[in-house]
Swiss-Prot record:
Originating species: Nitrosomonas europaea (strain ATCC 19718 / CIP 103999 / KCTC 2705 / NBRC 14298)
Tagged with keyword DNA repair: no
Cellular component aspect of the GO annotation: cytosolic large ribosomal subunit
Function as written in the Swiss-Prot or TrEMBL entry: Forms part of the ribosomal stalk which helps the ribosome interact with GTP-bound translation factors.
Gene: rplK
Keywords: Methylation, Ribonucleoprotein, Ribosomal protein, RNA-binding, rRNA-binding
Name the UniProt record assigns to this protein: Large ribosomal subunit protein uL11
Assembly, per entry: Part of the ribosomal stalk of the 50S ribosomal subunit. Interacts with L10 and the large rRNA to form the base of the stalk. L10 forms an elongated spine to which L12 dimers bind in a sequential fashion forming a multimeric L10(L12)X complex.
Length: 143
C-alpha cells in the first residue's frame, strides 16, 4: 500500500549548500522530518551543479516521517541575470532596459529549463524565456 502523504514543502536552496539553519530546518522540523538526512541527500544530488545557484526543490512528507524530494531547474530569472551579467533586473522593465540577450543565449536557457516549461517545442520555450527577460528589463535580439 502507498504511504500516506501529509504535505509538500517547496523551498529554494543554493546548490550544495543545504544546512539545518532557516529556511530548511524550520520547514522540515514542522513536519518532523530528519533535517540532516535531507541536507546530506540534497547536497549529494546537487553536487554536480554550479555551487550557489538556487535550486527549487519539492519535498513530499509522508506520515511515517520519511520523505522524497524532486529537484527543479534553476529559475529563469537567475539564469537570465547570469548570462546578461546583471545583479538585478530593472525597476521599470518596459521603460529602462538594463541588459541584452541574444537568441542563442535565450535558446541556451530554454534548453536548461525545457523539463520544467509547459512549452510544446523549443521555439515556444525560447519565446517564454524572452518574455521573462523582457519583464525584467532585458532586451532579447532575434525573438
Amino acid at each position: 500500500m502507498a504511504k500516506k502523504i501529509v504535505g509538500y514543502i517547496k523551498l529554494q536552496i543554493p546548490a550544495g549548500k543545504a544546512n539545518p539553519s532557516p529556511p530548511v530546518g524550520p520547514a522540515l522540523g514542522q513536519r518532523q522530518l530528519n533535517i540532516m538526512e535531507f541536507c546530506k541527500a540534497f547536497n549529494a544530488a546537487t553536487q554536480k551543479m554550479e555551487p550557489g545557484l538556487p535550486v527549487p526543490v519539492v519535498i513530499t512528507a509522508y506520515a511515517d516521517k520519511s520523505f522524497t524530494f524532486i529537484l527543479k531547474t534553476t529559475p529563469a530569472s537567475v539564469l537570465i541575470k547570469k548570462l546578461a551579467g546583471l545583479s538585478k533586473g530593472s525597476a521599470q522593465p518596459h521603460v529602462d532596459k538594463v541588459g541584452k540577450l541574444t537568441r542563442s543565449q535565450a535558446e541556451e536557457i530554454a534548453k536548461i529549463k525545457m523539463a520544467d516549461l509547459t512549452a510544446a517545442d523549443m521555439d515556444a520555450a525560447v519565446r517564454t524565456i524572452a518574455g521573462s527577460a523582457r519583464s525584467m528589463g532585458v532586451e532579447v535580439d532575434g525573438v
